[in-house]
Every structure is written in C-alpha cells, then in structure tokens.
C-alpha cells in the first residue's frame, strides 16, 4: 500500500504508512520501509520533480518495462541531477543492468554508490549486491570477499552484516 501510494505520487500518505512499517518485526521489511521513507522525505525537501520521476521509474521497473525506466532515470540525471537522489538512481540503474545481464555495468554502478556516496543509506546494500554479483555472476571471488569485508568493517550496524559475514566465511573456506 505504501509503495502504491509512492508510485501514484501520494508521498505524504506513503510516508505515514512507511512510518508504521518501520516498526515491523522483520528487519528486512523495516529496512525496506526505512529506505523508501528516506528517499521520499529527503527528496520532498529537496527536489519533488526528481522524486516524481524516481517513483515513475520505480513503477516501470515493477512493470518490467526497463527501457522506459532507464529513460526516466536518464531524464533525472540530465535535468535534475542532485546528490540526494543520485545513489538511489544508480541503484535502480544497477538493478536494470542486472536484469539485462549487463553485469559489468551493474558492477560499475554499485561501485559508484559505495565509493562516491559512502554516507548514503543504501551504500551497504550496494556493497552486498555487488559482492553477490562478483561472486555469482562474474566469478571474481577475491573481489567479492573484499566487498563482504568492507561491509562488515565499515557498516557494522547494517542489517546485512550477518549475511556478509556468512558469505565471507564460506568463500574463505572454499579458498583454503
């Protein structure tokens, strides 16, 4: 319901529902709610045009209309570039690249997020997604281990630390 309200541009309503979901018992649901809530609240204050385009791009992604989503994301980058929405925009472009099996592009987009926007609320997720990409799709286990280690060391409060720690141990055991 919150995401639907976000898609149709009812941001205040969406925020109200997301604030309830943030107290969810599931860490991942609460984290997803927090991510969307931060995206909306940050952009409501800064740039509502970019927020409208981001929500439209997200809706296209939901519909699996990736070409239209990419066009919408490119229009934000061209006409409304801002530091607030850029990490989220890059994560959406990486998601599309993954779907298109353009793994090298996805790798570079994830890197741009956690290297250029390390203070972003999605930098930890970008590190995790990149580690999984490197491990499973590009067969670069050493690079994946570095991403997992960076996530463990630099994002100690992340909900993804346990997953990263388990993956790191598994890869280290395979290596030895």
Report the location of each language-model feature:
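Acidic, polar-rich low-complexity tracts and alpha-helical solenoid repeat scaffolds
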Residues: 1-176
